[in-house]
Curated annotation (Swiss-Prot):
Residues holding S-adenosyl-L-methionine: N13, L15, G40, E61, D85, N103
Name the UniProt record assigns to this protein: Ribosomal RNA small subunit methyltransferase A
Source organism (scientific name): Aromatoleum aromaticum (strain DSM 19018 / LMG 30748 / EbN1) (Azoarcus sp. (strain EbN1))
GO MF entry, a single one: 16S rRNA (adenine(1518)-N(6)/adenine(1519)-N(6))-dimethyltransferase activity
Reaction(s) catalysed by this chain's protein: adenosine(1518)/adenosine(1519) in 16S rRNA + 4 S-adenosyl-L-methionine = N(6)-dimethyladenosine(1518)/N(6)-dimethyladenosine(1519) in 16S rRNA + 4 S-adenosyl-L-homocysteine + 4 H(+)
A GO CC term attached to the entry: cytosol
Glycoprotein found in the keyword field: no
Keywords: Cytoplasm, Methyltransferase, RNA-binding, rRNA processing, S-adenosyl-L-methionine, Transferase
Domain of life of the organism encoding this protein: Bacteria
Pfam families, A to Z: RrnaAD
Cited function: Specifically dimethylates two adjacent adenosines (A1518 and A1519) in the loop of a conserved hairpin near the 3'-end of 16S rRNA in the 30S particle. May play a critical role in biogenesis of 30S subunits.
Compartments, as annotated in UniProt: Cytoplasm
High-level lineage: Bacteria, Pseudomonadati, Pseudomonadota, Betaproteobacteria, Rhodocyclales
Length: 265
């Protein structure tokens, strides 16, 4: 089969450095018997060692040319191929506990992370390679430039850890940016205390929708000036100053104050 050319519409950059590949696989530490799914196996740089260590692997791939290569290379007993868009894939069908890994396409990384977060209850952990600037947003702390909606919503559900960086030269073709490896471990359900997570998402989206505006303005759909002292929060702050716990407290306060907010979330 002829050499596959990376496709921009799928955000393809193929990992090719054997030392980096080994380091990533060691960080994942796959063990036979685990249910592991790789998103975007590409040319199989991570697929080969994963199959070797696990015995069987699930993959989700949208590129039909790459799917044909995978069918040629692996037997169904070793590799289960799920053809389609990872953004629409129901990861719950693979069972639990599930481990999710992959070199995520840069062009869909943020919506894909939000999609994957929906399956947190069924996941043991997730280890991804992403654009470094996205990873910095994922692990950012309150009060920093990178802290935003992605930070809050992922940190509400996961314990996040940036493991190490991957230089552009480790890929073919080489991207213009550095990548990072991030691990996401779901938090226990008892630590996720928002009474309604859909409402939490709305509150966080509003707080960061216009970053230069204060909470007094961004949250006025739900909170009056008198509500902020009850919460112990300064209405003159901007969204990036609040912790995840602050957003949960605001959400639960709104839910208690106005049951309609829950119904409309």
């Amino acid at each position: 089969m002829s050499e596959h050319r990376a496709r921009k519409r799928f955000g393809q950059n193929f990992l090719s450095d054997p030392n980096i590949i080994r380091k990533i696989i060691d960080a994942i530490h796959p063990v036979p018997g685990e249910t592991v799914v790789e998103i975007g196996p590409g040319l199989g740089a991570m697929t080969d060692p994963l199959v070797e260590r696990l015995g069987h692997l699930h993959v989700v791939e949208i590129d039909r040319d790459l799917i044909a290569r995978l069918h040629e290379r692996y037997s169904p007993e070793r590799l289960t191929i799920h053809e389609g868009d990872a953004l629409k894939f129901d990861f719950a069908t693979l069972g639990a506990p599930l481990r999710v890994v992959g070199n995520l396409p840069y062009n869909i990384s943020t919506p894909l992370l939000f999609h994957l977060a929906e399956f947190a209850a069924r996941v043991r952990d997730m280890t991804f390679m992403l654009q470094k600037e996205v990873v910095m947003r994922m692990v950012a702390e309150p009060g920093t430039e990178d802290y935003g909606r992605l930070s809050v919503m992922l940190q509400y559900r996961f314990r996040m850890g940036r493991l190490f960086d991957v230089p552009p030269g480790a890929f073919r073709p080489a991207p213009k940016v550095t990548s990072s490896i991030v691990r996401m471990v779901p938090l226990p359900a008892e630590q996720r205390t928002a009474k309604d997570e859909a409402l939490l998402e709305r509150v966080v989206a509003a707080a960061f929708g216009q970053r230069r505006k204060t909470l007094r303005n961004t949250l006025r759909e739900w909170l009056d000036e008198a509500d902020f002292p009850a919460l112990g929060i300064d209405p003159g702050l901007r969204g990036e100053r609040l912790t995840v716990a602050d957003y949960v407290a605001i959400t639960n306060y709104i839910a208690a104050k106005s049951p309609r907010a829950l119904a409309n979330a």
